[in-house]
């Protein structure tokens, strides 16, 4: 199941991790940094930068950014380097990346049950992938900072009233009132606080044995009874237990290391005031580090080679993700990669593809071939969620006649399967998946082992923005991917 690694987190309550940046490196690093050609944490301000809030009070914004700059960082450069090493392994097929979490976190969602449920499903999915794929798995949570969302329109109109669009709790509130929708820079500090609390709680859970495979009550596989693959699913879980017992018999003691796992955080680097305020230099390490997260990514709407987001992220030392969709031009993508990674650094660039099951075959092969021909090392990850979003109108049930966004489980799985095949044919690796999920029993995506229908969506539809896989669907997806990887 790969070499277990201890989890490391940082929050204001665990400042000992900040000393990693002071003590773990005995001499300055001589590696070239990415902060070249006139880059600074604020150089993005000279570029056209999309999807930024229209802050009403510049003084309040300056005060909030100053507060952020004084607060302890959320992650360390040591952890970021560790992730980059693991991403480099994924690029060559030695490792698989599991990135998942909420579409958009909310401040109210920072509560123990919700956090524990998300951690639980990611841990269980990763164990299934390790067992089925026979590869080490890196777990990256899409949380502890995923509080901002891009919008297709700056404004929203209801019943003749027009207000700013809801851009996530980092910017404004969801309620349709002038007070709630006004962009409030004080929310930037609240976002940092919620992220720190989330990291602190996750660390305490893992330290306390939450990831311990010796506790069968953490595994809820009731849903497999609804699937024709039930026997295969149960056998996979049994094999994990058998492997653990074999290791313990072999060494004669309990394998304590499996109580702790490595875990990283990620979010879309959208609001650059927030990112800039937490970008710092650290002792004994070269370059600038975005210490708000281990792994930021650039969305499709902001992936402009000459735009502010690419300008900002080209100068930090973190690995950087880039969302790639049907509108992505191969030449523009190569320009983005060249700007973000002039040194062709393994583990630096992660391309997260989001086409939809209906479009992936028409778009992904030519992009894969273009990047492969360039010789640049990248990690390819499949996001099977965003390209498969659709709006349906249930014909019966609680939500009868009301349009609702959803995703079909069959389409999600089909996009992943096509991605595997396209990379196999091209001689490249699918290095991971990027999914929106929750560990709770929501009804937002249709299909899966229970056969959720459009008419059942209103029973438990709680997403703030886009539909997510529920616990059962997420674990079923992991098992089906593991089955595909084992072929």
What are these regions (language model features)?
Residues 340-342, 348-379, 386-442:
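Non-transmembrane, aqueous-exposed alpha-helical and coiled segments at domain scale
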Residues 9-172:
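Long, contiguous, compositionally biased segments that the model treats as domain-scale units
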Residues 3-8:
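Short, positively charged low-complexity motifs
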Residues 104-105, 110-356, 401-407, 415-416, ...:
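Active-site-facing alpha/beta catalytic cores
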Residues 82-84, 306-309, 336, 365-367:
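Glycine-rich, charged/polar anion/phosphate-binding loops
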Residues 18, 39, 44, 55, ...:
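A residue-identity detector for tryptophan
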């Amino acid at each position: 199941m790969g070499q277990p690694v201890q989890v490391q987190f940082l929050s204001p309550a665990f400042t000992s991790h900040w000393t990693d940046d002071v003590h773990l490196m005995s001499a300055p690093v001589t590696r070239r940094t990415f902060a070249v050609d006139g880059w600074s944490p604020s150089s993005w301000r000279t570029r056209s930068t999309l999807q930024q809030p229209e802050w009403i009070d510049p003084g309040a914004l300056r005060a909030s950014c100053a507060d952020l700059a004084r607060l302890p960082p959320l992650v360390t450069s040591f952890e970021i380097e560790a992730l980059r090493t693991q991403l480099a392994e994924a690029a060559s097929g030695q490792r698989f990346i599991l990135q998942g979490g909420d579409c958009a976190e909310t401040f109210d969602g920072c509560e123990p049950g919700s956090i524990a449920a998300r951690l639980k499903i990611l841990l269980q999915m990763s164990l299934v992938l390790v067992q089925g794929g026979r590869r080490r798995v890196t777990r990256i949570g899409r949380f502890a900072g995923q509080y901002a969302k891009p919008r297709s329109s700056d404004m929203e109109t209801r019943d003749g009233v027009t207000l700013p669009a809801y851009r996530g709790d980092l910017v404004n509130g969801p309620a349709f009132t002038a007070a709630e929708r006004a962009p409030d820079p004080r929310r930037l500090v609240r976002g940092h606080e919620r992220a720190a609390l989330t990291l602190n709680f996750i660390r305490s859970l893992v330290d306390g044995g939450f990831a311990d495979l010796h506790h069968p009550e953490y595994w809820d596989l009731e849903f497999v009874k609804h699937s024709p693959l039930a026997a295969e699913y149960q056998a996979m879980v049994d094999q994990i237990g058998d492997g653990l017992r074999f290791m313990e018999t072999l060494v004669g003691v309990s394998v304590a290391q499996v109580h702790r796992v490595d875990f990283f955080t990620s979010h879309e680097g959208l609001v650059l005031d927030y990112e800039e305020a937490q970008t710092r230099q650290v002792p004994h390490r070269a370059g600038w580090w975005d210490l708000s997260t281990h792994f930021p990514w650039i969305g499709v709407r902001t992936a402009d080679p000459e735009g502010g987001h690419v300008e900002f992220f080209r100068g930090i030392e973190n690995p950087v993700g880039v969302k790639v969709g049907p509108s992505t031009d191969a030449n523009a993508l190569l320009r983005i990669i060249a700007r973000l990674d002039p040194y062709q650094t393994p583990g630096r660039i992660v391309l997260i593809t989001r086409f939809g099951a209906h479009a992936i075959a028409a778009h992904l092969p030519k992009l894969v071939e273009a990047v492969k021909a360039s010789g640049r090392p990248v990690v390819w990850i499949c996001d099977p969620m965003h390209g498969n979003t659709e709006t349906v109108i249930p014909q019966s049930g609680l939500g009868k006649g009301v349009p609702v966004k959803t995703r079909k489980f069959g389409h999600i799985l089909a996009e992943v399967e096509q991605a595997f095949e396209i990379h196999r044919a091209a001689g490249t690796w699918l290095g991971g998946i990027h999914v929106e999920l929750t560990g709770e029993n929501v009804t937002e995506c249709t299909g899966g082992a229970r056969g959720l229908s459009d008419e059942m969506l209103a029973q438990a539809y709680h997403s703030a923005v886009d539909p997510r896989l529920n616990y059962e669907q997420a674990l079923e997806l992991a098992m089906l991917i593991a089955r595909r990887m084992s072929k």
